[in-house]
């Protein structure tokens, strides 16, 4: 599946990205490369391959559930721009 220049413009608009005329060819090549990789992965015969959650079948070492660090809240909040009642105050980003 090869994308056309018009497809790149449509994808950029849907993703709310500004792609200039000069960048369009490079973006088209990169997207076509991604789709080629996906097609190559789809072509691999995986019949009989057992799904796995992790490539190494090893159990992770667990440490004891014990406190290993001291309380540094006051030191961290001393350098914070704004703190109130032990909480960090941050600017509102969503109206």
From Swiss-Prot:
Pfam families xrefs: GatC
Protein name, as recorded: Aspartyl/glutamyl-tRNA(Asn/Gln) amidotransferase subunit C
Catalytic reaction list: L-glutamyl-tRNA(Gln) + L-glutamine + ATP + H2O = L-glutaminyl-tRNA(Gln) + L-glutamate + ADP + phosphate + H(+); L-aspartyl-tRNA(Asn) + L-glutamine + ATP + H2O = L-asparaginyl-tRNA(Asn) + L-glutamate + ADP + phosphate + 2 H(+)
One of the GO biological process terms: glutaminyl-tRNAGln biosynthesis via transamidation
Source organism of this protein record: Laribacter hongkongensis (strain HLHK9)
GO MF, one example: glutaminyl-tRNA synthase (glutamine-hydrolyzing) activity
Gene: gatC
Record-stated family: Belongs to the GatC family.
InterPro entries cross-referenced by the UniProt entry: Asp/Glu-ADT_sf_sub_c, GatC
UniProt keywords, alphabetically: ATP-binding, Ligase, Nucleotide-binding, Protein biosynthesis
Subunit relationships: Heterotrimer of A, B and C subunits.
Known role: Allows the formation of correctly charged Asn-tRNA(Asn) or Gln-tRNA(Gln) through the transamidation of misacylated Asp-tRNA(Asn) or Glu-tRNA(Gln) in organisms which lack either or both of asparaginyl-tRNA or glutaminyl-tRNA synthetases. The reaction takes place in the presence of glutamine and ATP through an activated phospho-Asp-tRNA(Asn) or phospho-Glu-tRNA(Gln).
Enzyme Commission (EC) number: 6.3.5.-
